[in-house]
């Protein structure tokens, strides 16, 4: 993130920075035990506030300004922003719904790890999800779909982790799928691993895309500045820090070695540079789509915050701490955007 470089180079540097903070967060597994949820929940709340502020000042505000200054929409200048924002949220939502149908109904990082670790796969078969992943370790952000494919009566593709935790607490662990089924490693294990990697990729596209679009928009309007894009990358990096820990800490508690838990924790941030470069290329080559692209990235980010990060921070009894941490994060990011932008 240096002045004087192309938007694509800036996006690459920015997303390497966000990936690095994901890895730094995952590395806290070497320091914290799996029982220290207050630290994780407070960090997730802070990250949610930071990203809400960054989504507005670094993405939505420039998108609105571009739509208004183009002159082609008149009183309907809100339309491209509303369309892009809705499509961004819908992208993440539809990806969530499609994952079980693609055979990736398990949570991506954990399921991928189990596919590559036969000993833990046997442990999962023998003890069930309740023993391998205790109720206190059930984490939404590890993946939106649970370890168990939990169909709900109202037609939803799956239930949230909170519902899974309640079910496990009230009744015996559900039996694992039979041998030879799609949920077991075997002849189709490489296909399943590829699907799980795809799931991880889709779930982390919004962060990288937001950074790339932010740098690609620099100079297009008064509010789309280098400082604004830099602050956006900083905000996403702050968000990714506890996300890395939210993956590595439960894996460590599940019996993975510290190094393996760290590896899978940082894995989610690895795809962000690719999404960032794509976003920067897209808006540089097709400038008219900028308002849509900025709003799309904002919609995807806000959906992830509301659907994943905030609920996860609330499930372990630390809701008040997480809420006040969110307020603090919003104020800090707002101050950075206004003061340094």
UniProtKB/Swiss-Prot annotation:
Q: Where in the cell is it found?
A: Cell membrane; Nucleus; Cytoplasm; Golgi apparatus
Q: Which organism is it from?
A: Bos taurus
Supply the alphabetized keyword list: Cell membrane, Cytoplasm, Golgi apparatus, Ion transport, Membrane, Nucleus, Transmembrane, Transmembrane helix, Transport, Zinc, Zinc transport
Known catalysed reaction(s)?
Zn(2+)(in) = Zn(2+)(out); Cu(2+)(in) = Cu(2+)(out)
- Recorded family membership: Belongs to the ZIP transporter (TC 2.A.5) family.
User: What is any one GO biological process for this UniProt entry?
Assistant: zinc ion transmembrane transport
Q: Does the keyword NAD apply?
A: no
Q: What does this protein do?
A: Zinc importer that regulates cytosolic zinc concentrations either via zinc influx from the extracellular compartment or efflux from intracellular organelles such as Golgi apparatus. May transport copper ions as well. The transport mechanism remains to be elucidated.
Tell me which domain of life the UniProt entry assigns to the organism this sequence originates from: Eukaryota
Protein's UniProt name: Zinc transporter ZIP11
Identify the stretch annotated as signal peptide in this record: none
Entry's Gene Ontology cellular component terms: cytoplasm; Golgi apparatus; membrane; nucleus; plasma membrane
What is the protein's membrane topology class? Multi-pass membrane protein
Q: What is its main location?
A: membrane
Keyword DNA-binding: yes or no?
no
> Can you name one GO molecular function term for this protein?
zinc ion transmembrane transporter activity
- TM annotation in the entry: 12-32, 44-64, 72-92, 193-213, 262-284, 289-306, 321-341
């Amino acid at each position: 993130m240096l002045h004087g470089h192309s938007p694509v180079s800036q996006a690459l540097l920015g997303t390497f920075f966000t990936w690095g903070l994901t890895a730094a967060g995952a590395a806290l597994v070497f320091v914290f035990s799996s029982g220290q949820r207050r630290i994780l929940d407070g960090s997730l709340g802070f990250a949610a506030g930071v990203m809400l502020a960054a989504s507005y000042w670094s993405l939505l505000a420039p998108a609105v300004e571009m739509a208004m200054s183009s002159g082609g929409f008149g009183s309907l200048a809100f339309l491209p922003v509303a369309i892009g924002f809705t499509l961004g949220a819908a992208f993440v939502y539809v990806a969530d719904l499609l994952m079980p149908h693609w055979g990736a109904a398990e949570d991506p990082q954990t399921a991928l790890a189990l596919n590559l670790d036969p000993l833990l796969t046997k442990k999962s078969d023998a003890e069930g999800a309740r023993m391998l992943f205790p109720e206190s370790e059930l984490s939404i952000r590890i993946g939106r779909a649970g370890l168990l494919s939990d169909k709900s009566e109202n037609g939803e593709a799956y239930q949230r982790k909170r519902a899974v935790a309640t079910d496990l607490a009230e009744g015996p662990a559900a039996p694992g799928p039979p041998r030879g089924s799609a949920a077991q490693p075997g002849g189709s294990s490489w296909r399943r691993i590829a699907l799980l990697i795809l799931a991880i990729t889709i779930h982390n596209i919004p962060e990288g895309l937001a950074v790339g679009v932010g740098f690609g928009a620099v100079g297009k309007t008064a509010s789309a500045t280098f400082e604004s894009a830099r602050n956006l990358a900083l905000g996403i990096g702050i968000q990714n820090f506890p996300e890395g820990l939210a993956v590595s800490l439960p894996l460590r508690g599940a019996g993975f070695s510290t190094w393996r838990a760290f590896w899978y924790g940082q894995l989610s941030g690895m795809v962000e540079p690719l999404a960032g470069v794509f976003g920067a290329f897209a808006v540089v080559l097709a400038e008219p789509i900028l308002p849509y692209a900025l709003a799309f990235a904002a919609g995807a980010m806000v959906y992830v915050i509301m659907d994943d990060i905030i609920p996860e921070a609330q499930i372990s009894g630390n809701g008040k701490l997480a809420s006040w941490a969110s307020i603090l994060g919003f104020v800090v990011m707002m101050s950075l955007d206004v003061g340094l932008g």
